[in-house]
Amino acid sequence: MKLVLFNDYRLGVLQNGNVVDVMASLDGLHFHKPQEMVEGVILGWDQVKPKIEQEIQGKEGVPISDVTLRAPIPRPPKLICAAVNYLEFGQRKPAILDAFLKAPTAIISTGETCELPPVPASIFHHEPELAFVIGKTATKVNQKDALSHVFGYFNFLDMSARGLQGAVGNSFFLGKCWDS
């Protein structure tokens, strides 16, 4: 099932190129902000999923081209990114895994304008990435159990201000964590 947030942060299901509004299936879920709605859906998935499945039966929805897609996780409480672009630098073996935190305020929706920071970057670069949504508390998880913590996934663009990392050692913060 492909969940989307669209227009004024309404929950929908993408099927056959159309978006079906499923807000009615969230009856009883209390939230004030889109992020709270998303968290409620994830945490209550076992109860919400059957309601959504029933809601989409026989509904055509509207073409995806007629809606404005929003960020699927509007303000993630934690966004951890892996810094392992070894293929980009011509290395044959993966580099040692490094990670960095990205600010939730760096998240924008499809079609929104990414504001470039006023820094002396050598180039601003977008990198397509795969994001995993962790759906339950995950601390010291064994590799064999890791996927049981994944609620879903989506693609995103990681924006980088290249040429700044060397100025502060090997930190990715200055090059990747600007508000947008």
Question: Model regions: which residues?
Answer:
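Glycine-enriched loop-and-adjacent helix/strand subsegments that border the catalytic/binding cleft
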Residues: 70, 76-180
